[in-house]
Amino acid sequence: MLRQSCSFPVTSLPALGGVCGREGAGAEVPPAACGCEGRDPDTERSCGRSSTGGCSPCSGPGPSSPRTSRGALSPSLGRLFPHLQVVIKLRIQLAPAVHLALPTCSLLTSSPPLEGCCHRLNEEAEVQRGFRPIAVELEFENQPLGAETRLRNGRRAGVKRSEGRGQVRPGQVRSTGPEGGLTRMERKAARLQWDSGSIKMSENEQLWEEP
């Protein structure tokens, strides 16, 4: 089993469709600059600007069960973390042998960073100084795809080598003679040369075509 943990920066996005606590691009936004109203896309809870001008977190706890199930990714995950597009493509490429455990989190840009309504499959993730740890868990049934591919290519290459030039395939008959055996193609060439008188065959050398 391969486990890999990565940290991605909190991506600030415009408050479209009621996305809570994100505006602008690329940096953490102080509470006074937040202009978010609506509902959190991951928890379906209301969020918005408080009376003091700061962004309020999700009102109340999130749902009891995460919206992401094993084998399915939240639609908003790709928008929140553009870096995970590669991971999503990786899951599609390796499915069904690989299962990804990814969290769905509501990003909070309050200062100091708060642990918000963040639910994942096995444990909660925390927001620390603008970074949210994202643990990607890959479970392989047998072995990684690359190793299986190399092994399969090696088997194919081994078959080709065993049937290469100079090898006699099963069922191929060599004639016996003082000068050694001849393959089928060699017998054809020898028959043509013998018919033309350029060579003479020994008494023990028999030229015949395979049925």
Swiss-Prot record:
Disordered, as annotated region: 45-74, 147-211
Sequence ranges of Polar residues compositional bias: 195-205
Low complexity: bias regions: 48-71
Protein's UniProt name: Putative uncharacterized protein ZNF252P-AS1
Organism the protein comes from: Homo sapiens (Human)
